[in-house]
């Protein structure tokens, strides 16, 4: 894994050093990768990290920290989780890496007792805001998993705490560090796709999204499967769509002006409270629309973000670029030549409907050639670099905030059945 991370790091470094002014303006968070390596610094100069929330995502991020700790001089000093099985699993992972973090079941005790430079918050969504705010007030930089918070007010309070304290607040939108997306966005912003008319994204699964509950305990069911209950999460919206809405905002370099949507529980009638399928339309001030849908009972189309302009299309998840004028296949080219030369004589053609307007059969071309990378590792490396610098590009925080706030407004639009705009007090 370290070799893969190194190759992608070099890609980002090259983009940061050789990229155009427009590229760095659109992705200013890349600038950190143009700085010299910190590997030669003394052991006392290690960036001290605490992980709050050691469930599945927290442990996944820890694995990346293990691979980054030497090249970036990171030290995992403490772990915190209210659920002992998760905490012990994470501690066992550390032991295998000869790491001995201090364990906590209360994050406030961690803040009072440990000296840390940064925290990684990977708790359930409804816990993000108060933990992040307390950390920033304690003088600690924050990496918080997406979405930002459970409510509009909590999200704004997090952003305000970031402004007031001057501490880093990075939200976990790893696509911002993904070389495919960075290269694709450069093409979009350079005008390679022409005028953008519509953006579409979807995330389709075919499972109930439930996690196993020890002994089928009713007491811990909501605790383990928090994504399915409105008190803790907006389900498909905050856990999935927020990623793809961030991509749409990034491509357009703006935020929506309105949202409308619908959703229901049509398949998994198992006691969950969040919708198992949703569809939304976000409109922008130039008339461009971002059309989104997500479902949990069919996975044929998987997930994708499609950025469509009059000159071409980019599909990020599959790493493809499609021009609107693809080169003709050899057989078609021969047919055209034969018709132009009169080989077939007169041909009767029944008008414009002669060619059905089905999907174009064209495989496109890759956005980049090598896609062996871990964007979640690259975003954590960026976090470490920002901690050393004492600041992060404000655009990075705004990307996370705007994606989160408009995701939550989308939830309200579905619940009310209304077309909504964002109140002025939430705009930044």
Stretch-by-stretch model annotation:
Residues 19-97, 178, 248:
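N-terminal Rossmann-like dinucleotide-binding module
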Residues 124-125, 129-177, 191:
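Beta-strand-loop-alpha-helix segment that lines the small-molecule cofactor/substrate pocket
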Residues 100-121:
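A structured beta-alpha segment of the ubiquitous adenosine-cofactor-binding alpha/beta core
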Residues 53, 57, 164-171, 175-272, ...:
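Predominantly a Rossmann-like dinucleotide-binding segment in NAD(P)-dependent oxidoreductases
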């Amino acid at each position: 894994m370290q070799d893969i991370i190194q190759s992608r790091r070099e890609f980002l470094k090259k983009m940061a050093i050789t990229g155009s002014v427009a590229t760095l303006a659109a992705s200013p968070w890349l600038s950190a990768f143009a700085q010299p390596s910190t590997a030669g610094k003394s052991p006392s100069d290690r960036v001290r990290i605490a992980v709050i929330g050691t469930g599945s995502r927290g442990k996944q991020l820890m694995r990346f920290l293990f691979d980054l700790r030497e090249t970036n001089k990171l030290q995992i000093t403490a772990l915190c989780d209210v659920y002992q099985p998760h905490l012990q699993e994470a501690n066992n992972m550390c032991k295998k890496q000869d790491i001995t973090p201090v364990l906590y079941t209360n994050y406030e005790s961690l803040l009072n007792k440990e000296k840390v430079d940064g925290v990684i918050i990977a708790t359930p969504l409804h816990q993000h805001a108060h933990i992040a705010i307390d950390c920033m007030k304690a003088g600690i930089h924050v990496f918080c998993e997406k979405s930002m918070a459970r409510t509009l007010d909590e999200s704004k309070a997090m952003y305000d705490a970031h402004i007031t304290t001057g501490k880093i607040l990075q939200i976990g939108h790893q696509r911002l560090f993904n070389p495919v997306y960075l290269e694709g966005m450069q093409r979009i912003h350079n005008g390679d796709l022409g005028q953008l008319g519509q953006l579409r994204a979807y995330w389709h699964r075919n499972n109930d999204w439930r996690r196993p509950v020890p002994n089928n305990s009713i007491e811990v069911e909501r605790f383990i499967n928090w994504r399915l209950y409105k008190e803790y999460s907006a389900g498909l919206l905050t856990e999935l769509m927020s990623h793809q809405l961030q991509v749409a905002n990034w491509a357009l370099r703006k935020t929506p002006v309105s949202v409308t949507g619908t959703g229901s529980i049509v398949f998994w009638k198992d006691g969950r409270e969040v919708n198992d399928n949703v569809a939304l339309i976000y409109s922008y001030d130039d008339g461009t629309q971002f059309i989104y849908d997500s479902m949990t009972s069919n996975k044929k189309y998987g997930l994708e973000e499609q950025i469509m302009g009059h000159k071409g299309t980019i599909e990020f998840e599959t790493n493809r670029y499609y021009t609107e004028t693809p080169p003709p296949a050899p057989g078609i080219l021969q047919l055209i030549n034969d018709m132009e030369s009169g080989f077939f004589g007169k041909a009767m053609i029944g008008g414009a409907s002669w060619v059905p307007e089905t999907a174009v059969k064209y495989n496109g071309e890759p956005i980049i050639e090598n896609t062996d990378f871990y964007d979640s590792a690259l975003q954590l490396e960026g976090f470490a670099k920002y901690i050393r610098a004492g600041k992060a590009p404000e655009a990075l925080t705004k990307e996370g905030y705007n994606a989160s706030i408009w995701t939550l407004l989308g939830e309200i639009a579905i619940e009310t059945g209304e077309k909504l705009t964002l109140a002025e007090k939430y705009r930044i």
